């Protein structure tokens, strides 16, 4: 019962966040300087892909933040060269309250956000929508309201992801 109420509260907060995202001015970007990647645990091992993506746009590794979303209670910590934060459903409070310990992270503004997941789930969408990003890129099977650019490809196809994002994002920048 508590999980159902928590899910309902998170769904309401997600709705508020989606409204906020849709009303944001997108403005003209000339260059991306910061990158946020929100991914499921199954895609968290793609550090090389994320670094290659950032390199295409001249984003320094120090300006990359990865958020890994998991259903597990206990997460294995993996040492990476990219700033990485792990979230579980327990990280989010009962009424969809985000962790106080990561308040600064949620206040930070990102130039580009990649929603590197291809499914629709309230927890994933809520965390993704909680960040302040100028431009959001995602995949076709997730909530389209989350993203400004939607790629109809499989996230497991790394080379295709690099090619497609390079094509479309460079067109947006020019």
Residue map of PLM features:
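Short N-terminal or domain-adjacent regulatory/targeting segments
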Residues: 2-34, 41-44
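Structural beta-sheet core signal
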Residues: 37, 66-68, 138
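Histidine-anchored nucleotide/phosphate-binding helix
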Residues: 38, 42-59
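Structural motif
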Residues: 38-42, 69-70, 116-118
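Short, charged/polar "capping" segments at the starts of alpha-helices
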Residues: 44-46, 72-77, 146
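Conserved nucleotide-cofactor-binding alpha/beta core module
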Residues: 58-102
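Active-site and donor-binding regions of nucleotide-sugar-utilizing enzymes
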Residues: 91-155
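Active-site-proximal region of nucleotide-activated glycan assembly enzymes
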Residues: 144-174
């Amino acid at each position: 019962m508590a999980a159902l109420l928590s899910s309902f509260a998170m769904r309401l907060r997600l709705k508020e966040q989606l409204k906020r995202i849709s009303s944001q001015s997108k403005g003209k970007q000339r260059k991306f300087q910061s990158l946020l990647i929100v991914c499921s645990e199954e895609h968290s091992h793609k550090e090389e892909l994320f670094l290659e993506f950032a390199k295409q746009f001249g984003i320094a590794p120090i300006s990359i933040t990865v958020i890994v979303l998991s259903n597990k209670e206990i997460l294995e910590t993996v040492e990476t060269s990219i700033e990485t934060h792990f979230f579980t459903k327990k990280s989010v409070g009962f009424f969809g309250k985000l962790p106080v310990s990561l308040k600064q992270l949620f206040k930070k503004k990102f130039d580009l956000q990649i929603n590197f997941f291809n499914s629709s789930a309230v927890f994933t969408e809520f965390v993704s929508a909680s960040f302040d990003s100028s431009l959001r890129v995602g995949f076709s099977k997730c909530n389209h309201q989350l993203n400004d650019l939607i790629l109809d490809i499989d996230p497991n196809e790394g080379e295709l992801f690099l090619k497609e994002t390079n094509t479309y994002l460079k067109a947006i920048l020019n």
